[in-house]
């Protein structure tokens, strides 16, 4: 199952989150050579890992085998702060119904395709359940055929550019019941996301983030 982890239930997953930060460092720094992310403690953590982040992590027992994260675009996001030039045509989203999707990873021994489909289903399922309409992402262009094959509806926000020697783009992905139904059929599971502990209201949290950001600007 893919576990949804947020501020309201992270006390149940502290060991899992720590393991996942170290896996991110192994994959994005040691394997993919994103040297700007290197940290001496071997944990890949950035400004978008905070109390408003939602992690969707694939667990086998307590072992993390894959995952990704969501972040409210009503706060300064990776796209708006680091890569706004990639969204120069349509602009960076800032909406409680649009969350930024990033740090997608799968451990080496599970890169057979099956877990990828489960992780793609998870973002659709979690967002549909929460009333989120779209996710935004900074992604390498080679993701486009993968998303198309999974039935994702992708809208570019600007022109691609080279980032870390890879052609990279900004886009939104629609959250659609039809897409999720097809993915559920393909993975052979009627549901893939598990939310233990208190239930998160992601849209309400994003609205609060937006209010706080507006107050800081007007102060």
From Swiss-Prot:
EC main class here is: transferase
Q: Which family does it belong to?
A: Belongs to the autoinducer synthase family.
Biological process, per Gene Ontology: quorum sensing; signal transduction
Between which residues do disulfide bridges form? none
PROSITE patterns associated with the record: AUTOINDUCER_SYNTH_2
User: Which reaction is catalysed here?
Assistant: 3-methylbutanoyl-CoA + S-adenosyl-L-methionine = N-isovaleryl-L-homoserine lactone + S-methyl-5'-thioadenosine + CoA + H(+)
Write down what this protein is called.
Answer: Isovaleryl-homoserine lactone synthase
Please describe what this protein does: Catalyzes the synthesis of IV-HSL (isovaleryl-homoserine lactone), a quorum-sensing (QS) autoinducer molecule which binds to BjaR1 transcriptional regulator to activate expression of QS-dependent genes. Is active with isovaleryl-CoA but cannot use isovaleryl-ACP as acyl donor.
The organism's taxonomy opens as:
Bacteria, Pseudomonadati, Pseudomonadota, Alphaproteobacteria, Hyphomicrobiales
Q: Which residues form a coiled coil?
A: none
Q: Which UniProt keywords apply?
A: Autoinducer synthesis, Quorum sensing, S-adenosyl-L-methionine, Transferase
Give EC number(s), comma-separated: 2.3.1.228
Q: Which Gene3D superfamilies does this one have? A: 3.40.630.30
Keyword field contains Transferase: yes
Report the domain of life of the source organism.
Answer: Bacteria
Molecular function terms, GO-annotated: acyltransferase activity, transferring groups other than amino-acyl groups
- Stimuli inducing this protein: By IV-HSL via the transcriptional regulator BjaR1.
């Amino acid at each position: 199952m893919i576990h949804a982890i947020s501020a309201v239930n992270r006390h149940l997953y502290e060991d899992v989150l720590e393991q996942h930060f170290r896996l991110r460092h192994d994959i994005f720094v040691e394997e993919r050579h994103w040297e700007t992310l290197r940290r001496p403690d071997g944990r890949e953590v950035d400004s978008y890992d905070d109390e408003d982040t939602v992690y969707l992590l694939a667990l086998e027992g307590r072992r993390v085998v894959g995952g990704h994260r969501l972040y409210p675009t009503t706060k300064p996001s990776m796209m708006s702060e680091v890569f706004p030039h990639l969204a120069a045509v349509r602009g960076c989203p800032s909406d409680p119904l649009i969350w930024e999707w990033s740090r997608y990873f799968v451990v080496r021994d599970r890169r057979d395709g099956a877990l990828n489909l489960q992780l793609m289903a998870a973002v659709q399922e979690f967002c549909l359940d929460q009333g989120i309409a779209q996710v935004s992402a900074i992604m390498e262009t080679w993701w486009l055929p993968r998303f198309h094959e999974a039935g994702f509806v992708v809208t570019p926000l600007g022109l691609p550019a080279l980032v870390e020697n890879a052609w990279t783009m900004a886009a939104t992905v629609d959250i659609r019941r039809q897409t999720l139904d097809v993915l559920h059929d393909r993975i052979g599971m009627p549901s893939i996301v598990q939310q233990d502990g208190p239930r998160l209201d992601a849209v309400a949290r994003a609205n609060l983030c937006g209010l706080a950001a507006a107050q800081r600007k007007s102060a």
